[in-house]
């Protein structure tokens, strides 16, 4: 699915917060990466973040 830059930032930020608070990491992370934002970006690039976006359909008048 294609996300806007704002949706992408929100997803990565929310997932990074979860990781920082102790949530389990879904992918195998290299030992040199310890920053939650970097881990969340890796998860986003691999399409494994367990967060979904519900987009409201546009209402035409």
Curated annotation (Swiss-Prot):
GO CC, one annotated term: DNA-directed RNA polymerase complex
Keyword check for Coiled coil: no
Matches recorded under InterPro entries: DNA-dir_RNA_polK_14-18kDa_CS, Pol_omega/Rpo6/RPB6, RPB6/omega-like_sf, Rpo6/Rpb6
One GO process term, biological-process aspect: transcription by RNA polymerase I
Entry keyword Nucleus: no
Keywords: Cytoplasm, DNA-directed RNA polymerase, Nucleotidyltransferase, Transcription, Transferase
Record-listed E.C. numbers: 2.7.7.6
Enzyme class: transferase
Superkingdom classification of source: Archaea
Annotated compartments: Cytoplasm
Pfam families: RNA_pol_Rpb6
Reactions performed catalytically: RNA(n) + a ribonucleoside 5'-triphosphate = RNA(n+1) + diphosphate
Known function: DNA-dependent RNA polymerase (RNAP) catalyzes the transcription of DNA into RNA using the four ribonucleoside triphosphates as substrates.
Family note: Belongs to the archaeal Rpo6/eukaryotic RPB6 RNA polymerase subunit family.
Xref: HAMAP family: RNApol_arch_Rpo6
Subunit organization: Part of the RNA polymerase complex.
Name of the protein this chain belongs to: DNA-directed RNA polymerase subunit Rpo6
Species assigned in the record: Thermoplasma acidophilum (strain ATCC 25905 / DSM 1728 / JCM 9062 / NBRC 15155 / AMRC-C165)
Lineage of producing organism: Archaea, Methanobacteriati, Thermoplasmatota, Thermoplasmata, Thermoplasmatales
């Amino acid at each position: 699915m294609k996300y806007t830059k704002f949706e992408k930032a929100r997803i990565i930020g929310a997932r990074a917060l979860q990781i920082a608070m102790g949530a389990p990491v879904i992918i195998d992370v290299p030992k040199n990466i310890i920053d939650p934002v970097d881990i969340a970006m890796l998860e986003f690039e691999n399409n494994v973040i367990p967060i979904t976006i519900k987009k409201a359909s546009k209402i035409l008048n």
